[in-house]
């Protein structure tokens, strides 16, 4: 299975819809496992504050914050594919979180890989913009 640019960009949106549902508490029981399934077992990220985070830590973050941001809205825009091979895509996008407490905007760069015939997120780097 070769990775397709449009599917990679759609994955950004699908994943962030699930994140918004989980954080807002407006999610179904299957949404958290579906969200975690987007990530490769070896996934790691560097969050916007500069901390290195493993898949287990990301999973814990989602589990522990279910319903704790009822007013969160996540908007994704400026998606660009930087590099594409048959089995990997590097892309960037801007992510805007709006809550009653304020707005956070970050620019992210992610690596998606084909693993066992599925598109999985392997790496993510976030940088605060505002």
For each predicted feature, which ranges?
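A beta-strand edge to alpha-helix "cap/lid" segment located at domain peripheries
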Residues: 2-11, 17-29, 44-130
């Amino acid at each position: 299975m070769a990775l397709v640019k449009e599917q990679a960009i759609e994955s950004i949106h699908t994943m962030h819809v699930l994140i918004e549902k989980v954080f807002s508490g407006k999610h179904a029981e299957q949404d958290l496992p579906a969200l975690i399934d987007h990530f490769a077992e070896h996934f790691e990220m560097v969050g916007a504050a500069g901390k290195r985070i493993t898949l287990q830590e990301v999973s814990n973050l989602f589990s522990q914050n279910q319903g704790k941001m009822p007013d969160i809205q996540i908007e994704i825009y400026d998606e660009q594919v930087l590099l594409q091979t048959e089995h990997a895509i590097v892309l960037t996008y801007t992510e805007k979180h709006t809550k009653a407490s304020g707005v956070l905007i970050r620019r992210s760069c992610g690596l998606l890989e084909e693993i066992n015939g599925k598109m999985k997120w392997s790496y993510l780097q976030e940088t605060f913009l505002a």
